[in-house]
């Protein structure tokens, strides 16, 4: 099987980002975004999805976290999309319901090439360790856009902001683990193209 590894970079006046992913990795990561809680979430995503992620970002955090969070998602999504190649043999779909103490999150994903994100969650705290919680939804929207994925995320239960966000990232991780898994030899579509 061809190695499913890809790198993608983006440099603007606001951010300078490089990401490398290995879809058939062991969940190792080296994440540096400058946003402590985002680093924690991406490390958790890597560990639980089994996708190796190397990501470095230098952003205009003196302004706020918006550009960094958005651009990290755009670059990570594009690297994953490129690593998927022609998507021959992948499961394509993945889903997970993940608890974290009182929090319960659900994620369903379709890697079929149609970008759309539905996000249903509310957070009590406006900021957690440098991450504006309003940017969590924007992260997933941006990720789905460049990953060309249909992504549905929802909080089913919970109150603690840390637990809610971490459960969302872990549910994405387990859904991705399933969706990128190679289990056949054909493109998983009646169109024979994704």
Curated annotation (Swiss-Prot):
Which chemical reaction does it catalyze?
D-erythro-1-(imidazol-4-yl)glycerol 3-phosphate = 3-(imidazol-4-yl)-2-oxopropyl phosphate + H2O
Q: In which pathway does it act?
A: Amino-acid biosynthesis; L-histidine biosynthesis; L-histidine from 5-phospho-alpha-D-ribose 1-diphosphate: step 6/9
Q: Name one GO biological process term.
A: L-histidine biosynthetic process
Q: Which Pfam families match?
A: IGPD
Q: Which of the seven top EC classes does this enzyme belong to? A: lyase
Coiled-coil regions in this chain? none
Q: What keyword terms does UniProt attach to this protein?
A: Amino-acid biosynthesis, Cytoplasm, Histidine biosynthesis, Lyase
- To which protein family does this belong? Belongs to the imidazoleglycerol-phosphate dehydratase family.
- Name of the molecule in the record: Imidazoleglycerol-phosphate dehydratase
Its lineage reads: Bacteria, Pseudomonadati, Chlorobiota, Chlorobiia, Chlorobiales
């Amino acid at each position: 099987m061809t190695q499913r590894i890809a790198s993608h970079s983006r440099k603007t006046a606001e951010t300078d980002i490089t990401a490398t992913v290995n879809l058939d990795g062991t969940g190792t990561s080296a994440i540096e975004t400058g946003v402590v809680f985002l680093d924690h979430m991406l490390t958790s995503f890597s560990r639980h999805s089994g996708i190796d992620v190397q990501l470095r970002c230098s952003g205009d955090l003196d302004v706020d976290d918006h550009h960094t969070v958005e651009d990290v998602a755009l670059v990570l999504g594009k690297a994953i999309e490129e690593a998927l190649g022609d998507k021959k043999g992948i499961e394509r779909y993945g889903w997970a319901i993940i608890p974290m103490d009182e929090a319960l999150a659900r994620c369903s994903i379709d890697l079929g090439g149609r970008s759309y994100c539905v996000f249903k969650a509310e957070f009590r705290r406006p900021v957690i360790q440098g991450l504006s919680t309003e940017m969590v939804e924007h992260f997933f929207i941006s990720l789905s856009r460049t990953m060309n994925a249909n992504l549905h995320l929802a909080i089913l239960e919970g109150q603690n902001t840390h637990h809610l966000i971490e459960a969302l990232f872990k549910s994405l991780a387990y859904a991705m683990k399933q969706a990128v898994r190679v289990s056949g030899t054909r493109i998983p579509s009646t169109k024979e193209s994704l």
